[in-house]
């Protein structure tokens, strides 16, 4: 089912200007949430994990206390930007490297690009793939 959902989403939103509505169900961490994607004029709803495109936030199961603290704040901040139960929009949907998850530009209720907000507020870093930079400072 997940393969079909991702294929459908990629086909439906091949134009960058088209937005797909999503109801936020659960914040997972600072750059990932579970959302109910509304398909077919609001008739069908499918749950999917969405990773905010172009941003990297610290990991909750991080390598040091500082990373874990920052990760918990990033999760809280994402929840403030896109509260559970609200309807937001996603654009530029792409397959994620992990099965069952998609990457997308995420826009809050005010139309702000959530990834850009997280980077601007220094809650996350710009990320375009590849090796992630560490969040822990080595002595």
Give each language-model segment a name.
Residues 4-13:
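Sec-dependent N-terminal signal peptides
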Residues 15-139:
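Small beta-barrel nucleic-acid-binding modules, primarily SNase/OB-fold domains
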